[in-house]
Amino acid sequence: MKSIIKLMVVFVCVVSLVACGRKDTTVSANKDGVLYEAGVGVSFYYPSDFKLSEGNPNDGVTRFTKENQILFYKVEENEYDNDTDQLSELYKGELEASEVSSLKVKMPALESGLKCYEYKGSYVKTGLKFIHLVYFDDKNTYVYGYEANRKDFRKNLKKMIVYLESFTKSSVL
């Protein structure tokens, strides 16, 4: 009986040492990020160490950059009169046409209650990995995405998902 207790104490000590050495970071978008209001009723957070990039004002894309990483936001007018599921398939088709591999689609639950789609994959030509959070309404498609090289993407994915999922759009205009 004493040997079992000693074994348990040793086991708890080893687990404690390993757990203390783990590096676990918690990200809070509203504490660690910057609020960006993209228009009437549309807002999201981006990391405070990313900088708003002055890109082409005519392409309608807002970019936030840090080294080899980019967060972007864009709104596209819906050209088709389809329901959300059909628009999701059309967006998936657009990504596939731009030669992406390992494309996965899922529907995460956002705290804001928005029904959106998450597209995750990589571009064949550039090797960049991406995750796009896409929200469809009757008139527009809203895309908030993260793209980076494989190393940075893998390292920062959990953190970036917190920011992507901070996207909110109110229906009150």
Locate the predicted segments by residue.
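N-terminal secretory signal peptides that target proteins for export/translocation
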Residues: 1-2
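Signature of long, low-cysteine stretches enriched in small and polar/charged residues
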Residues: 92-139
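Short beta-strand element of the conserved SAM-dependent methyltransferase core
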Residues: 64, 72-74, 117-124, 134, ...
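N-terminal targeting sequences that direct proteins away from the cytosol to non-cytosolic compartments
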Residues: 5-9, 15-60, 138, 147-173
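Glycine-rich phosphate/pyrophosphate-binding loop shared by adenosine-nucleotide-utilizing enzymes
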Residues: 142
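Second-shell loop/turn segments in exported
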Residues: 36, 74-81, 120-121, 146-153
